């Protein structure tokens, strides 16, 4: 099965709240068949959400929430109901209880296993989304190593963000290969390290990530979704997402 393409709506910033019709129009015009966002029912209501998707001919690849939303039982139930109503299989989680302590990761892993089991029973998939901080040393072990050993690979999958792996000084191709049993939903992000040491986000193909090598590894791992994610851009939104979409088509074959 060939992976499908989508875009994360984070690149549109505040327009997601003020101009959602324009945002999804840009997604459609750029050539993306799908997108990833949060719980659209909470922001726009169910009827408007369905109207927006139908009018633009778009699908939703996945739903993304922070750790605290998963730790809140009421929020979790609302998000599960949303995903089931919309036919969304993949739920993403960013963050842990405490990124600076081993105990924070272990506490989070216990919750991830519980939620992963619950979602699996509902026909959904729990995916942990990495940043760079999971690769920081916590006294002989990293957060990513804790997550890898303390969670059940059949319940907790990885939403691998290839840029953050590279930004942390690791090889994203090797990371994908080492976690192929958890890989399926990918964030393809590009960028570079700025003069201040912070991440500078760029359109796909304009940064430091070897994306052609990453797509080969992702395909070998059975990728279902390749989602273009750019936290922010200096370009007009439509120009930005069109550049990334064209790169995905011409260089990645997605």
Segment roles from a protein language model:
Residues 1-89, 181, 249-254:
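N-terminal pre-domain/capping segments
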């Amino acid at each position: 099965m060939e992976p499908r393409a989508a875009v994360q709506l984070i690149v549109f910033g505040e327009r997601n709240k003020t101009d959602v019709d324009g945002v999804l129009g840009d997604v459609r015009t750029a050539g993306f068949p799908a997108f990833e966002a949060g719980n659209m029912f909470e922001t726009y209501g169910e009827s408007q959400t369905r109207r927006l998707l139908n009018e633009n001919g778009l699908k939703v690849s996945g739903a993304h929430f922070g750790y605290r939303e998963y730790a809140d039982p009421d929020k979790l139930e609302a998000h599960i109901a949303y995903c089931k109503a919309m036919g969304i299989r993949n739920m993403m989680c960013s963050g842990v209880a405490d990124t600076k302590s081993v105990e924070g990761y272990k506490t989070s892993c216990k919750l991830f296993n519980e939620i992963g089991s619950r979602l699996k029973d509902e026909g959904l998939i729990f995916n942990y989304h990495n940043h760079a901080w999971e690769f920081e040393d916590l006294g002989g072990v990293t957060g990513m190593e804790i997550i890898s050993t303390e969670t059940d690979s059949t319940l907790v999958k990885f939403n691998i963000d290839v840029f953050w792996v590279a930004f942390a000084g690791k090889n994203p191709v090797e990371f994908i290969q080492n976690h192929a049993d958890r890989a399926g939903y990918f964030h393809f992000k590009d960028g570079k390290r700025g003069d201040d040491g912070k991440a500078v986000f760029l359109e796909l193909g304009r940064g430091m990530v070897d994306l052609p090598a990453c797509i080969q590894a992702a395909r070998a791992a059975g990728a279902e979704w390749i989602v273009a994610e750019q936290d922010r851009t200096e370009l007009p939104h439509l120009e930005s997402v069109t550049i990334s979409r064209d790169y995905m088509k011409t260089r990645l074959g997605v």
